[in-house]
Amino acid sequence: MRQESLVTKYDYDFENDSIFFYGSNKKYRSSIDLDGIILDIGEDDQIMAIEILDASNRFNLAKEDLRNIKYFEARIEVSEENIRLTMKMSVNKRNKLVDKGLDALGLNSINLPISTQGIELNC
């Protein structure tokens, strides 16, 4: 089953170098940490927000560039054993769009149901 969510906001914390993509009106149930990428799960077992710690190093960008995110998308594939996360982001750097990607894999330690989910943000 494929579920799509449109997040409406993002916050970049320059000092702590973390990005938080959010905006869903779902009710929060729990979080899972995939080695510094935190997925917030709603009561419906769908991903409702993503926080990326140490973001500038993970995306190989300057911190200043992360203040100019123009597009973000994430594909989350949940299997019985694992959660695989594939992210793409575009930032405006010197009046030019620069595309970056990031993948993460972790255990499905909270037994989320098998699904494929997508999150997208246009700024």
From Swiss-Prot:
Gene Ontology biological process terms, A to Z: purine ribonucleoside salvage
Root EC class: transferase
Keywords of the record: Purine salvage, Transferase
Taxonomic superkingdom: Archaea
UniProt note: phenotype after gene disruption: Cells have increased resistance to the purine analog 8-aza-2,6-diaminopurine (8-ADP).
Entry EC number(s): 2.-.-.-
GO molecular function: transferase activity
Function as written in the Swiss-Prot or TrEMBL entry: May play a role in purine salvage.
Name of this protein: Putative hypoxanthine phosphoribosyltransferase
Organism: Methanosarcina mazei (strain ATCC BAA-159 / DSM 3647 / Goe1 / Go1 / JCM 11833 / OCM 88)
Lineage: Archaea, Methanobacteriati, Methanobacteriota, Stenosarchaea group, Methanomicrobia
